[in-house]
Amino acid sequence: MKIVSFSLEQGNKYFGDIDKDRFFIGKSVPYLRNKGLINNTGTPGQKYDRNDFRPAFGFWADFIHPTAMAEGALYHTLNTYDGAHFTFSFLQFAAHVPNGDFVRYFRELLKLPLAAQYFPDLALHNNRISLITGAVPVSLESDSSTTDLMEYLNPSIKSIESTEVIQAAKFIHWVQNDPQHRQTQIEIGITIFKEKMVEYARRYGLDGVADTICLVIADIRHQGRASSAEIQTALRSSKPLDNLLDIGKSRFPHRIDVLRQEIGVLTKAGTLGVRKYSAAKNDFV
């Protein structure tokens, strides 16, 4: 079992220690009336690199790249200060959505060999993340709620508790030291983007539409920064890509700048701008 110790240093920075390995957990930040942890710093080797995953996932490894960069791209990207209570991964999977990306990700993590080392009190029971407190496992999530899971990870977003720091430390140390954990992040991220493209193609009429336009729509929906009506209005315009990229630029200027930059680089390289989405194949051709 992995034992976590941690210290608060320099006023607002938390550092952890597992197996005599010291690492940065995150820094304390205020958010509206909340308070939590953020970790968005790391080395290039701790970031998603599409080249590493193209052999296994093909163009989809490139397709998610701009969104990954906009989300920070670090496998240990963390925030615990907003309504999701706990957000983690290179695509910032959020714990507040029932059967959502974080829940699906955590379920898969609990199947890995090291799961019992990091979370000995959890197990999958009927494919639900469950707390093992006695003879009967107690599910922490359902089709309608993840409240118990959020509280398990981070009891309150009003202050920083030891539980929150320890759970964050486990996720960070695990992903930094286990290639299978990182692979799981990628598999879940790409699987969900592929599934969502089926929905988006149907809702927005994206069969035969350019990869760049599909990518921006997927990013908008991933972040949740616009309604379907706004997306449809941009799609009907004379410059759909530009108008889609303009959505949310006043509220999220950095994210939009990153998207524009990464799409531009990949387009110039001939990676983007040459494929269209095929609804029949659920793939870009």
Task: Give the ranges of each region predicted by the language model.
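Cell-wall polysaccharide-cleaving catalytic domain and substrate-binding groove, primarily
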Residues: 1-208, 212-285
